[in-house]
């Protein structure tokens, strides 16, 4: 429902906005100041602002709406729409009028809850004696809502009083207890009592139970039964034999001794599923998840006992299978009824069992001893050995050294069929990967084949090496020697001392570093300083001598006279023009695009045109103004000197050097005689141009920019020195 409100100005208006187009939500009133103009105009919080001074707010941002309200001249007209927000529902439950008793130690018995007087308390003779139970006298005093028995009261009779009740016992006397047994209250009172809480901490039943327990403590002190000092009896332990936890404890205690030991061994050796997956990834899954028979066999051999067990851990095994004697009576006791439990507690029996059923699994934890864990670990390795154990020298055949020739050298299949086939016997390989990988690969790769196998660089970079290099690796890696892998090479190889004598060196190493023949001469040659494009060069003749250079064209040794050009040597008959094949021995040539040309061919095909004389440029070329010039054609229009690599200025389409351009065309300052360059501040006065810092008084040198001045003999003067005679 829309409605319009007009607020009389001026501001403040007394409301706050929220939302807008930039917040992707409509403009709403978020807050109204109490007593303000907005509150007096019946604006409600949460109403939607549809229009401000007749302007729709659908396209307004939050800032635009604020500015629109601020710009209101005198009155502010708002078109609002009632919020569709539902009425908040209270989440708290309505208060329940329940009758609560009067608190005896905080309420005067002569006053009611609302302060009205009640009947006076009866005489002390009418009160109940300490020996009689106070329950019949309390029942007609309280309302029916509190007269019914509850489970809390029955349990409170059998429970041990806590510290609050002990403090009550210390502070009250027997006479005070008799007063508590007969409190005064209005019968049938239904008004709520003061200082109470939902759990009934100060209810009548709680006070009655406290008084009854205090009476029982006094009777126990008088009869001499119970603990010394008149304290309350200790509660007997109530065992719920029907609970699943109790049944599981009894079942674990009644297990036979061998089954308990077997469970302890399995719990100490088995691993979780994540450890089994990790073992499969690392290749050690043969050690995981053993069956029960293997575990039983691992603990039965006698030869492992003296190695792994100790005197401190041996007595733990027989003791772990026996349940504690103190826990067995409580475990076998039948469930007690509720009435029997109260009777046993009322008699103040102190013969409760010393241990609870929760202590029964404790000896099971001691069944795991280092003896079992240590003896089962080595037995796991021996239980999986199917057949005779492989000796230490045998695994030497399964090494990287025996497999390398098949990867690097394409030796025929007949070479590997006789000897390595016999060495790859299933004895060390088939049982498990453990015995095959026990020797480290480092000592297996150090025997004599390592220094003798010295291939040339060609097989290392080509997938198929030359056939003449095959015999060397095949001899070095043919078969596996029967010697153990742990023995050093100077023991297994008889010629080790001759090979590695201090004064000897192998020739195979020199073959690796030195090539068989000289490398092919590439046309690159030594680096020559680069020349400018189009530079005319000439070859230099050299007579025959002891020097034997290589020709830059045919890459052959030159016998006899030769030419030297562009940093290389040439046969005289092979140093020709790339186009007309004319010999360049006695004529000039030009290098262009990695080729040499005679002057005539270069002028015809490659030489650029000069922009001034319109002829071919042979030699150094000047590039300026996006054109090519002879160095002698591109000169200053005033002094006719070539520019070279210096700066020049253009004026009326002609180039000028910097000196002539300043003298001819630049504006000079009349004060300092220096040119006024572009970007400099200048002043035009007295028919001349001045720098802004040069237009000063000729006498006192005060800057006259923007100031009145006088002139005398074409020089500016300030007002103070205007009548100066001598200048």
Curated annotation (Swiss-Prot):
The modification Phosphoserine is found at residues 44, 121, 123, 217, 223. GO terms for biological process: actin cytoskeleton organization; heart development; muscle structure development; sarcomere organization. Residues 549-607, 608-667, 668-727 form the LIM zinc-binding domain. Signal peptide: none annotated. PROSITE patterns: LIM_DOMAIN_1, LIM_DOMAIN_2, PDZ. GO terms for molecular function: actin binding; cytoskeletal protein binding; metal ion binding; muscle alpha-actinin binding; protein kinase C binding. It is found in: Cytoplasm, Perinuclear region; Cell projection, Pseudopodium; Cytoplasm, Cytoskeleton; Cytoplasm, Myofibril, Sarcomere, Z line. Its main location: cytoplasm. The modification Omega-N-methylarginine is found at residues 219, 516, 533. Residues 1-84 form the PDZ domain. GO terms for cellular component: adherens junction; cytoskeleton; filamentous actin; perinuclear region of cytoplasm; pseudopodium; stress fiber; Z disc. Residues 140-156, 312-385 have a biased composition (Low complexity). Residues 428-440 have a biased composition (Pro residues). Expressed primarily in skeletal muscle and to a lesser extent in heart. Also detected in brain and placenta. Residues 188-197, 494-513 have a biased composition (Polar residues). Residues 86-197, 284-440, 472-529 are annotated as: Disordered. Keywords: Cardiomyopathy, Cell projection, Cytoplasm, Cytoskeleton, Disease variant, LIM domain, Metal-binding, Methylation, Myofibrillar myopathy, Phosphoprotein, Repeat, Zinc. It is linked to Cardiomyopathy, dilated, 1C, with or without left ventricular non-compaction: A disorder characterized by ventricular dilation and impaired systolic function, resulting in congestive heart failure and arrhythmia. Patients are at risk of premature death. Cardiomyopathy dilated type 1C is associated with left ventricular non-compaction in some patients. Left ventricular non-compaction is characterized by numerous prominent trabeculations and deep intertrabecular recesses in hypertrophied and hypokinetic segments of the left ventricle. Left ventricular non-compaction 3: A form of left ventricular non-compaction, a cardiomyopathy due to myocardial morphogenesis arrest and characterized by a hypertrophic left ventricle, a severely thickened 2-layered myocardium, numerous prominent trabeculations, deep intertrabecular recesses, and poor systolic function. Clinical manifestations are variable. Some affected individuals experience no symptoms at all, others develop heart failure. In some cases, left ventricular non-compaction is associated with other congenital heart anomalies. LVNC3 is an autosomal dominant condition. Interacts via its LIM domains with various PKC isoforms. Interacts via its PDZ domain with the ACTN2 C-terminal region. Interacts with MYOZ1, MYOZ2 and MYOZ3. May function as an adapter in striated muscle to couple protein kinase C-mediated signaling via its LIM domains to the cytoskeleton. This is LIM domain-binding protein 3. The gene is LDB3.
